[in-house]
Structures are given as C-alpha cells and as structure tokens.
C-alpha cells in the first residue's frame, strides 16, 4: 500500500510540473478594456474611449457628393482670388495690401494644386478656367473684376479690400457647409484650414479698410 501511495503522489507531482498554465484571466480582461486617449477635432479637447469605440471611431475615408462639390467649387473660387491678388503689385498704393495679396496668392495657389490632385485621384472632373461660378457665395462679378483691373492707387485698395472680404466670407460659408455635409477627413481638414486662415485675413482687411 505504501509503495502504491508513493507512486500516485509522484505521478501527480509530475503532472503538475508539466502542465502549461493559461494566461491570467483578470490580466487579459484588464488589457482588453484599457482606455485609449482619442484626440479631438480642431478646437475640441481629447477624450477617453474604450477599445471598442476606437475601432468604430475612425473617420470615413471615402468622399461623398458634398466633398466633391466643395472641392470643385473651391478650385474655381480660389482661382478668382489669385486673379485678384496678382493685380496688387502693379496697382495697389498700400505696401501692406501688397503684402497681404502676396500671402493670399502664395497660400491659395498650392491649395488649388492640392484640390486638383485630389479630384483626379477620386476620378472626378477638374473645373476648367472658364467654369461657371453661378451661385457660389462671395464671387466677384465680371463687371467688378473689370473695375478692379481698371483701378489704381487708393481706389484699387478700397475696391480690392471690399471684393476680397466678400470673397473670403463666401469661402467660409462654403467651408461651413461641407463640414456639416461632407464625409472625407482630408476635406474636413482643408475646410477647417480655409475657414481659419480666411477669418484671420478678413480681420486684417477690415483693419486696413478702417485706415483708408
């Protein structure tokens, strides 16, 4: 009997030593529910979310009709702003206005190229240089553009600031609309940048208007 008992104890000990322990269930649960810090949108604070929320919180990578229309319209909108800005060096009286016009041209030129490339990548039409801008907010009429080209000195400065302020306000309106109706994260970023940059430029132009 003693020999048999010793054999049983030895077998149990060997079995215990060779067993492969599984992962601690409590630790596995803790790892799967660890919180994640998600950055907020521009102007919004970061927030804590669960892993399950994180898996569904990725912005939609696809574009919808609102995104495409915004980019197509903004290409045309930006082109007119550049057409206005390139008149300033030879017609404006104010050095500050010439500097502002140069910054507008330098900012919106690359944005036109970015938007053109994005439309091509989406397989969408890029507006030509004679595209209609009927219904776009803030666009100068052909008559207003002719008047700007004919003006010089302080008369040019006044008309330029009036037209470009309205033009910027139109771009902000368009950007606000796509932030509500669009779905593509890159276009959301673009619209936020356009709205922020042009809001700051409107404030500067109003200061310049007050000094004329």
Q: Could you say what each language-model-derived stretch is?
A:
Residues 13-16:
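C-terminal motif of bacterial Sec signal peptides marking the signal peptidase cleavage site
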Residues 6-11:
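Sec-dependent N-terminal signal peptides
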Residues 1-5:
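Bacterial N-terminal signal peptides that target proteins for export
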Residues 18-212:
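All-alpha RGS (Regulator of G-protein Signaling) helical domain and cognate RGS-like helical scaffolds
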